[in-house]
């Protein structure tokens, strides 16, 4: 493993009824010390399943967004994210989370 990047990374994930995939999505992002701090912020659109509960069990912070919309969820997440770098992901594991460390490293090199 490379030296930890001196950066706080927040992964923002909008959700609505994603209990089937949210755990895999969170776990797909390596949590092996590649950055100084890594956290997950779930912006939930009033799920009626166990999405919020499962995300919290994985250590994610969860915010219930009463206003509807995918874009709204991201706007809320961006405003709330405590990280220096914000990464966005879909809740259904569409994108390979294992690539997040390399993408953030590349971003930091370009800074």
Model-based region annotation:
Residues 1-111:
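Structured catalytic core of nucleotide-sugar glycosyltransferases
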């Amino acid at each position: 493993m490379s030296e930890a990047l001196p950066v706080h990374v927040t992964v923002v994930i909008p959700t609505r009824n994603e209990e089937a995939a949210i755990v895999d999505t969170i776990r797909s992002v390596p949590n092996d010390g590649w950055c100084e701090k890594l956290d997950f912020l779930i912006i939930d659109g009033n799920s009626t399943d166990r999405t919020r509960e499962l995300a919290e069990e994985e250590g994610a912070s969860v915010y219930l967004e009463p206003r509807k919309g995918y874009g709204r969820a991201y706007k809320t997440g961006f405003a709330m994210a405590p990280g220096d770098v914000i990464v966005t992901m879909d809740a259904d594991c569409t994108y390979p989370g294992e690539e997040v460390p390399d993408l953030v490293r590349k971003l930091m090199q370009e800074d």
